[in-house]
């Protein structure tokens, strides 16, 4: 099917939906909801299609005027200027139109659960987890997103074995999803007398937050253990059994939550993380079954995949998926100015999807 035929088919579908919604008495409640959703999704696409069609019509009209032997010289000259101007606009509008036709990730509008864990490198890796946590929370503040720490395990000297947080706001998952993977840091530890460069790593997992209504978990599939929470070094920090460990028996996923003093709050947070992990597990299975979508785009987001290196001596950050290097390490890590990386990753993702857009 040609590009223009695809647009015509979409337009016909849109106006058919519009007609149906104008007479909702003919629709069941479920059909009305489904039609309304599809209509809303097509509305911005139709707006760009109209813009594209008007531009094409203008170009055809100007071309006819230019080729008409009865057109006087002055009018023909003006028509040529207008024709070339419209021709320059056409590729941009066509590109905009193709972007609007790309399949949407239904999770993009969701909030996100961000999990940061120390990898290889001991205490240096734990300190890097803290650095990444600060970078992402600063970025969240810039975007006017809200964030809440879900769980953390500190090392007692400024580092963390792991930190997880929930970030909520507009298009959080859409902007953070490409942060999943292995982040590597190269720097000289303060305790290193010889000045030798150490390499450490941390893993980041970005999961869409799933509401209870979107994913039901059977209570029979859960084993819930409660115990006293502990701090750095294993010492008890609570005299009541407030810490919660939830095991999802079918998948083997285990979530531990002990930050809150209330057992009820710890259980609620643990279930929130469990839902996100189960949803992500199913999503990864679907992606692998369909077309290995993650690998065909920017990268799999797999934790074994090194995605970015932070070199402190050179104030350099390199994203290996898109070969982008920026020499603004403090600006990015301390102030959270991540947009240049994020925009480039989104653009790369769109470019790869466009290659697979068969129209």
UniProtKB/Swiss-Prot annotation:
Question: What Gene3D superfamilies is this protein classified in?
Answer: 3.30.160.20, 3.30.70.1660, 6.10.140.1950
Q: Where in the cell is it found?
A: Cytoplasm
Q: Does the keyword Cytoplasm apply?
A: yes
Keyword entries, A-Z: Cytoplasm, Methylation, Protein biosynthesis
One Pfam family named in its UniProt record = PCRF
Provide the primary localization: cytoplasm
Question: Which InterPro entries does the UniProt entry name for this protein?
Answer: PCRF (IPR005139), Pep_chain_release_fac_I (IPR000352), Pep_chain_release_fac_I_sf (IPR045853), Prokaryotic/Mito_RF (IPR050057), RF-1 (IPR004373)
- The source's domain of life comes to Bacteria
Consult the record and explain the modifications the protein receives after translation.
Methylated by PrmC. Methylation increases the termination efficiency of RF1.
MF (Gene Ontology): translation release factor activity, codon specific
The cellular component terms of Gene Ontology attached to this UniProt record, alphabetical and capped at eight, are: cytoplasm
User: SMART domains under this entry?
Assistant: PCRF
Q: Sum up the protein's function in the record's words.
A: Peptide chain release factor 1 directs the termination of translation in response to the peptide chain termination codons UAG and UAA.
Indicate what this protein is called per its UniProt record: Peptide chain release factor 1
Q: Which organism is it from?
A: Ehrlichia chaffeensis (strain ATCC CRL-10679 / Arkansas)
Q: Which gene encodes it?
A: prfA
């Amino acid at each position: 099917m040609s590009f223009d035929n695809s647009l015509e088919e979409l337009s016909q579908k849109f106006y058919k939906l519009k007609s149906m919604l104008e007479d909702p008495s003919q629709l069941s409640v479920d059909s009305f909801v489904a039609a309304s959703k599809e209509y809303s999704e097509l509305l911005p696409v139709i707006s760009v299609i109209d813009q594209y069609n008007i531009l094409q019509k203008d170009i055809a009209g100007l071309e006819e005027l230019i080729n008409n032997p009865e057109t006087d010289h002055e009018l023909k000259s003006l028509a040529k200027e207008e024709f070339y101007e419209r021709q320059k606009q056409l590729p941009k509008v066509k590109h905009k139109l193709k972007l609007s036709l790309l399949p949407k990730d239904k999770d993009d509008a969701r909030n996100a659960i961000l999990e940061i864990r120390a990898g290889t490198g001991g205490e240096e890796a734990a300190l890097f987890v803290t650095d990444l946590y600060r970078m992402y929370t600063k970025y969240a503040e810039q975007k006017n997103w809200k964030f809440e720490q879900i769980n953390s395990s500190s090392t007692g000297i400024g580092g963390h074995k792991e930190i997880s947080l929930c970030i909520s706001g507009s298009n959080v998952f859409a902007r953070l999803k490409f942060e999943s993977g292995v982040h590597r840091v190269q720097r000289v530890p303060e305790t290193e007398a010889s000045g030798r460069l150490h390499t450490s790593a941390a893993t980041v997992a970005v999961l869409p937050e799933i509401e209870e209504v979107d994913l039901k978990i059977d209570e029979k599939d859960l084993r819930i253990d409660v115990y006293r929470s502990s701090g750095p070094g294993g010492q008890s920090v609570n005299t009541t059994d407030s810490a919660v460990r939830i095991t999802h028996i079918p998948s083997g996923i285990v979530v531990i939550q002990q930050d809150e003093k209330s057992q009820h709050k710890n259980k609620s947070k643990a279930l929130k993380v469990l839902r996100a992990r189960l949803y992500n597990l199913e999503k990864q299975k679907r992606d692998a079954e369909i077309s290995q979508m993650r690998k065909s785009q920017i990268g799999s987001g797999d934790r074994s995949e090194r995605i970015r290196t932070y070199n402190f001596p050179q104030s350099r950050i390199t994203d290996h998926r898109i070969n982008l290097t920026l020499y603004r390490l403090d600006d990015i890590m301390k102030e959270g100015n991540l947009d240049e990386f994020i925009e480039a990753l989104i653009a790369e993702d769109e470019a790869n999807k466009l290659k697979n857009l068969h129209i």
